[in-house]
Amino acid sequence: MNDFELIAKTFMGLESVLAKELTQIGANNVQIGRRMVSFTGDKEMMYRANFQLHTAIRILKPIAKFKAASADDVYEEIKKIDWSQYIEKGKTFSVDSVVYSEEFRNSRFVTYKVKDAIVDQFREKTGTRPNISVSNPDIRLNIHIAETAATLSLDSSGESLHRRGYRQESVEAPLNEVLAAGMILMTGWKGETDFIDPMCGSGTLAIEAALIARNMSPGVFRKEFAFEKWPDFDAELFDTIYNDDSQEREFTHHIYGYDIDMKAVNTARLNVRAAGLSKDITIDCADFKDFTKPAEKSILVVNPPYGERISTPNLLNTYKMIGERLKHAFMGNEAWVLSYRQECFEAIGLKPSIKIPVFNGSLECEFRKYSIFDGTMKEFRQEGGIVKTEDEKRQMAEKHRFKKNREFKKRLDEDAENAEADIRSFKFRSFERRKDNDDRRGSFGGKRFNRDEEKSFGGKRFDRDEEKSFGKRGGKSFGRGRDGEKSFGKGFKGDRKGGRGFNKKGFDDED
């Protein structure tokens, strides 16, 4: 098969993680962009990218690139394409537009021009026109315009790839599956130890951890992909990919999820059971403040409340409790915390060894690693302890460059006018900073003065009061206050379920 260009979309901050995934599944010419990674591959690679990638939101196949200075240019260029190759008689289509341009201030107008060009071509050639379907089209198109550079692509995924298909119910403000998988992959964990999420909510981190530990393809739960409706769909090839579990591996440790809210616990258990992963995951009701040291070496990954979408009383006290529990009950292990407010991180009271900026929806968060050990850092290193792996050092360097050069404080939406306003605001602030420095040097005889620089993460940080305690595989013990211990046994046993006959509910593209 011949190779062609493909584009994998993702969240800002996960580009390098996605690029590594693409390299591992055999993609060629992998290039990192903003919220996307381009690569080349054949039809099999396109199918595998949709089916196997944990951190991709959707996979696009560009079919035309052109310059457009006006809406009429877009119309004429789209009409040049032979649409009978892509849209068969009786099939429906839809168009999604992403526009960053002074010439095209309204992305909907671009959408209409693309639709008009396609419909007019069919009407002129055949006397009939294809129908538009927004909810469930046969062919999905995506047009991306940056100033005058336009790229028209076929969307091979359909609904967002974060919609795995295992989530039956969710709690308030659930963590996006793609972000959860990206967080776990950034830690470097692949199932070598037990995994703990003390504030598990609907169980997303625990389920994504199990998929990564077993190297299971997240697409196994989905009912369909958009490419299955394409005229050139190769059903035999995709069935081969779908049924190939040769890359899956054994997982000899265990995953524990805890939450203080029994409703969240029941929701997480339902989702774990739907994913057929009850053998690997135990979900129980427990409070993080009662967390005792796990019997087995473990990694802890937690997404506490931020105080944004979920109102959390005593937010800073929650983070203070997290720091206290990590310090006294997690010695010899490592913990990773995702948060949004700087003051919440400060309340933890521990020095992070790694800080990685990532976006949770529109919130610019940080994902921090804490290596918990006795004594001083020097003593820890002398005993062979590793604070940062080589991969983590490279990751930090990439993220620092990413943050330094980023033009926007908030995550860009698809509105060109807002994007331009952010750029102008950024340039103005940069100019004002330089002016302030010049004024200070002039006023104080050229002496330099240190300014207190506070890192901003899109606003204040958060915390969720849901979370638990941990125990041993098959029944770890956790202290529940002074009166005794609670035993946490293994959860439900369930068979792994494939996506084809799997009933699921719909979820939003972004949680």
What positions do the PLM features span?
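Basic Arg/Gly/Lys-rich low-complexity intrinsically disordered segments
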Residues: 1, 369-511
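Non-catalytic nucleic-acid substrate-recognition regions in nucleic-acid-modifying enzymes
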Residues: 2-137, 397
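Conserved Class I SAM-dependent methyltransferase catalytic core
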Residues: 5, 9, 13, 254, ...
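Short, charged/polar, Gly/Pro-enriched secondary-structure boundary elements
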Residues: 44-51, 159-162, 376-377
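Class I S-adenosyl-L-methionine
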Residues: 98, 123, 144-186
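A short, flexible beta-alpha/helix-coil linker loop
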Residues: 100-103, 160, 305-309
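Conserved S-adenosyl-L-methionine
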Residues: 175-293, 308, 316
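Short SAM/SAH-binding signature in class I
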Residues: 297-303
